[in-house]
Swiss-Prot record:
InterPro entries: Elong-fact-P_C, NA-bd_OB-fold, Rib_uL2_dom2, Transl_elong_fac_P/YeiP, Transl_elong_KOW-like, Transl_elong_P/YeiP_cen, Transl_elong_P/YeiP_CS, Transl_elongation_fac_P. Disulfide bonds: none annotated. Its main location: cytoplasm. Belongs to the elongation factor P family. Keywords: Cytoplasm, Elongation factor, Protein biosynthesis. This is Elongation factor P.
Length: 185
């Protein structure tokens, strides 16, 4: 059990039967009554943030989060298959758990699987990954006044905006958090 006096940013706790991570907290002592702890909590499975106030000294169950290195192997129908880097055990992940990350999953990409009490709750991609341009529109030469990007398709099928000089077959670096072009590889 963990008390409100032990709160730290990043601490994982169970609140009303749901797993949360403390994103922010502040001890508040009003003029009347006992001290309270104001907290912003990030839901570990859904990702949303809520604000709650707890009485000082209230206790919560601490949760254990573990990370394991996995390698993306292949997509089979609607599921994505990963292999544990240590045990070579394979797991199947549904696309709902991955969200927009599916746009950046290519074969043999190393990722981190996030487990909450032995239940897979998410996958973390590397922040910057190298991808190949599969298709690219032709840019209009001399068009530097208006929008200086064009749409290109990555090897995974995802669309991305790239500078005009990028052409089919080029290797680029992509930020997986924003889905934006970073630089040539």
């Amino acid at each position: 059990m963990i008390s409100t006096s032990d709160f730290k940013n990043g601490t994982n706790i169970l609140v009303d039967g749901e797993p949360y991570q403390i994103a922010w907290f502040q001890n508040h002592k009003p003029g009347k009554g006992g001290a309270v702890m104001r907290v912003k909590l990030r839901h570990l499975k859904k990702g949303g943030i809520i604000e709650r106030t707890f009485k000082s000294g209230e206790k919560f169950k601490a949760l254990t989060i573990t990370r394991q290195k996995k390698r993306f192997l292949y997509k089979e129908s609607n599921n994505f298959n990963f292999m544990d880097m240590d045990t070579y055990e394979q797991i199947t992940v549904h696309p709902e758990l991955l969200g927009k990350m599916v746009n950046f999953l290519k074969e043999n990409l190393e990722v981190e699987a996030i487990y909450l009490e032995n239940e897979l709750i998410g996958i973390d991609l590397p922040v910057i990954i190298e991808m190949t341009i599969a298709e690219a529109e032709h840019g209009i030469k001399g068009d530097s006044v208006s929008n200086t990007t064009k749409t290109a398709k990555l090897e995974t099928g995802a669309d991305i905006h790239v500078p005009l000089f990028i052409k089919e077959g080029d290797r680029i670096k992509v930020d997986t958090r924003t889905g934006e072009y970073v630089e040539r590889a």
